Amino acid sequence: MKNQLLQKQAHTYDAAAFKRPPMFFRPGTLFPILCEDDLCGLTEKFNDLKAKGIGRVAPWLIPASRYAKYTGSTLGIDYDTPEYWQALKTIQAAAEASGLSVIMHDESGWPSGQAGGKILEQGGNDWIRHTLQPTASNPINAEPLEKGSINPDTPQPDLLNPDVGSAVVELVLNKHKEQLGGSLPECMPWVYADEPTFGGIGHDPIKEFIWTEGLEQRFAERYGYRIEPFLPELTDPSQETLSLETAQARVDYFNLLAELFEKNYLKPIFEWCERNNVASGGHLLLEHDPRRFMEGGYGHLLRSFRHFHIPGIDSIFQESHPHKRSHHFPKYASSIARQTGRLCSSMPFGASSCAVTPAIFKWTIDHELVRGINLFLPWGYSPNDDIHYQWSRPVFGHFGPLWKYMDVAYLYTARLSYLLSCGTPECRTALYFDMRSIWAGEPWQNKAIEAQEAIAQTLLNTQHDFDFVDDLALKEASFSSDGELVVGKMSYDTLIIPPTDWMEPAAQEVVQRFIAAGGTVLSDSTPDTPLLRTTSPQPMLRVCKRNCLGESIYFLVNEGNDPIDTTALFAETKLPEQLVAESGECLPTYAEQQNGTVHMPLSLAPWESRIVRFTEAATSSPKISQSTQQQLDKWTSKIVEQTVIQEDKITTLTPEDNDFEASALTDWCESIGNDFTGTVRYQTRFNLTADERQQSWTIDLGDVKSACSVSLNGVLLGRKLWAPFSFKLPGEALAESNVLEVDVSNTLSNLFTSTEYLSQVDSIYSEEGARYVRILETWEKETRPSGLFGPVQLIRAT
């Protein structure tokens, strides 16, 4: 059986597949198991997940013996015990019965590379990470680093040691193969690595100078000189600027660590997966910030990503957020995925709190999709309603008021994952990834990072797509017949190289050949070849494009907090149609052809996105103007559900004999209270004459926090999780006297910032868990405002 994760995806767009996306493209979800109860009722839980649009589950057994302090786990099942394997088999059977695929974590906990502690049980101190601790008699004396890379209480194996890499293959991959049996592409199609590192959070690459056995000899063999004379200066944190010779030694040292990590850890896992028809995937540590690349402990980011069939990222602690930054970092992974013809994944929302409103969910997914991500494994699902296991949020689960809406969010994600995997990406610009300057230290490091950040931001702000290329990509590049730089599956006519002193000579030679072949090389400027043009500058408009056998698909995203109102100019000969990811619909759209360019009015609300497909079948629709007929101001409301904590369980209560009362359209925190989490039903009435009932009408709710369900005269109009909160009114549902009802549900932020809950945090969670909760509390308080804010307008199309 072929593993679909290892196959190239379809080249053509199919309307039926967009409407009902294949299970392959549906998002997965982490399935944390922190207690034995989480293993109960799996079939029911998996059926519910599938009904919500989930296609994969990633079971994550986290034993109390290693992680109680950090997660509150009470799970008495350790890795590589009969109970552990039985639990995985039970999960697999339930997933198969529900039609879900299983992603297998390569670690019971995190970070990867420990085999649940079995690695160090086998190798002892010799296999622990070591740091250089020179003595008077031994300048290369190395001592075990007793603290862990993420969990300080647990030492980390030395992932530069070839024996450790071999042991991981044996104690993790072969163990899973032996215990799970069957066809690996069926029972274990995707092995997920979570933050393997030879560094770690808080690791100072100078103060904690990583060393592995025989490194000095490998260094001499690799570079032809000894590192020992340079060590005093290399390991001195007070040395702000190094001599050129010492900086070269520093570059060579970090390059050697990168090579050892690739050769001794990543490559054996990748090759095992190749032999066994399994996709290797996952993400590294701190890949979102170039200033922390060396702390992340993965050597060279792009080179390491090449050793994943599905390179990926995660975005935790609001690293991607509309009120913080619109950064390019997903492109580190997606560049390698494009160049190798592979898929690219993301694990968003970890430890980002219940402040992940539906609108922020969409913004984050859009942010990563438009940068090349096309498979998702979001954090947040909790199989357990016990409050003790909700320390790392967001929380999506059957007990939350938004769960009944999540199929809209997950299917939105799936449709775009499918759509943006069709065909090939349109990308003609490559940006040099200068890892060697980062390794060199100051003054080169900061200059390289600032240049990369500035150029990448300018490219995004001017609607250019781009990929990163590094020294290895340049050295292995070829040239097309018309002189383009060919890197794997991608071809580039423009190469941007910020000023650098550290590009490898062999890469420099390729650049010169590219120039001789007619290629464009820029240093501190960007090309003027955007994917589309606009009649006014739009620095917060992001665009990507897919070419699908003569058709073009554009994904346009307003990442800003202000509306966009412009005209988009496309270099296309066909007319566009609009694809709607929320519903799978295809709608005609107004556009004009002028002098070989398609002009399309483009109005996007903050965080709104648009899919435009250019195809022979498309026809331009007439311009539709709208006039506001009336504003609906007289409202009543009542509570229909309330989510509370009872006996340490998150529970939903349904009030009895609850009558409608007059209500203003305002934050219900002011009327019901800050702590209220649940659903409120709003009701209003309006009249239409017989002539008016023959018109086309839309109801626009204005501002809603956070999600809503709308019905007219008992007929469900639909559900929305983000703006625009507008609904077409079907003619058959209209009456002379009409009753409009709007159910609004909010996030769990209000529950988790309630006075009662916060007063118990220190007794509910471990010290580390409580620390996390205090971080999340600040963000959750920012998203307390809830309800129907309006203005609600009844709009007639003319």
Regions found by a protein language model. Give the residues of each.
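Aromatic-lined ligand-binding clefts that engage carbohydrates, nucleic acids, or primary amines
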Residues: 568, 686-713, 721, 740-744
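Non-catalytic, glycine-rich low-complexity segments
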Residues: 662-676, 680, 759-798
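Short acidic/polar inter-strand loop motif in beta-rich domains
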Residues: 618-619, 745-754
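Catalytic and substrate-binding clefts that recognize carbohydrates or anionic sugar/phosphate headgroups
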Residues: 94, 111-182
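N-terminal regions that are enriched for targeting/export leaders
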Residues: 13, 46, 50, 54-57
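Aromatic-rich membrane-interfacial microdomains
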Residues: 717-727
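Short, surface-exposed tryptophan/glycine-enriched loops
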Residues: 687-689, 727-737, 748
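Carbohydrate-binding surfaces of carbohydrate-active enzymes
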Residues: 3-9, 21-28, 32, 39-44, ...
